């Protein structure tokens, strides 16, 4: 990023944080909300500060035998075809490209892929298409490919994702460091322009990668290598394949959280990193119902895998620390809001209520300050995501925790977004 743009982002962040500190200390002081505000501000400064120091890996990638694995279930036909075409267009050669249909009831997509592969023989010689007779879940679809490949590196791609031509080449630059066992790229919403929800989702994605994963990458411990675009060394996948397929939680089979599960396997071996120059666009839910189902799945995966991460406190304290921070921030927010509503409601006046809403808005702007350069107009929508986060996603997160044993994970029966 040019020095002028980075300076503008840093100065804007300092300005917003200064206002946030003033509002928090002046109006809420040492109350529960005030204490939460201090911890939140500290956490924001740490994450944003680390993200400002982040630099992508450079150099020419080594020679690897790479296999791409694309699981699909009831996917839109054109979307899956575009995914395949984007993988075929990679500047770094792929030895194999596996497309595994996981027992879809709608076979339009896999039929279109088979027709394309049979027609475009010259460019599809390394494409292997497989139809499973029974729907067993994303993990088993991926495992079918993993078991049949002798690749050094596995590239995982979701079936609704367009990866940029140099995405794989950029990701592999991180593997020049032999201590890196998994890497993920930068993700944005392909259908960002569809409606307000997709715009807000794109803002969130940009923060999740450009800030959160950038900060975690600086410590060598990103918590989730995202399904749309990630690479893993063979040593991460093959020795853990049976564990991956048959993972259980509280005595029940696990059918989600595959990305974080694989990332945890990589963390056991070494570093997990983010490569900002490896980019992809993916379809995101544009209806609130589908969006909330997706978030419910992610929340349950977050809590389940967080337990595993915290257990690493002796072997990998940084991973445990990042996880503890996320869990504590969630719990403190619930306590602070509860205290505000039930203990301090009588003391609330219009000025404090306005200040509280202002804090929500400013926190949202702080979190997404990187987006100011990318999409200035959309950046101003950040406070709307702050409201969505506080009044919808946080209660949903609490619901997900309370129903974590429920095996109805919210998977859609039609077009499934595997995340």
UniProtKB/Swiss-Prot annotation:
Entry cofactors: Mg(2+)
Keyword Cell membrane: yes
Designated name of the protein: Hyaluronan synthase
Organism this protein belongs to: Streptococcus pyogenes serotype M1
InterPro entries documented for this protein: Glyco_trans_2-like, Nucleotide-diphossugar_trans
Any single GO CC term annotated in Swiss-Prot or TrEMBL for this entry: plasma membrane
Family: Belongs to the NodC/HAS family.
Alphabetical keyword list: Capsule biogenesis/degradation, Cell membrane, Glycosyltransferase, Membrane, Transferase, Transmembrane, Transmembrane helix, Virulence
Molecular function in Gene Ontology: hyaluronan synthase activity
Keyword Membrane among record annotations: yes
Pfam family, one: Glycos_transf_2
Locations listed in the record: Cell membrane
Gene Ontology biological process: extracellular matrix assembly; hyaluronan biosynthetic process
Source species taxonomy: Bacteria, Bacillati, Bacillota, Bacilli, Lactobacillales
Enzyme class label: transferase
Membrane topology according to the record: Multi-pass membrane protein
Role noted for this protein: Glycosaminoglycan synthesis. The hyaluronic acid capsule is involved in the pathogenicity of group A Streptococci; it may be the major virulence determinant.
Any coiled-coil regions, as ranges: none
EC number(s) stated in the UniProt entry for this protein: 2.4.1.212
Pathway note: Glycan biosynthesis; hyaluronan biosynthesis
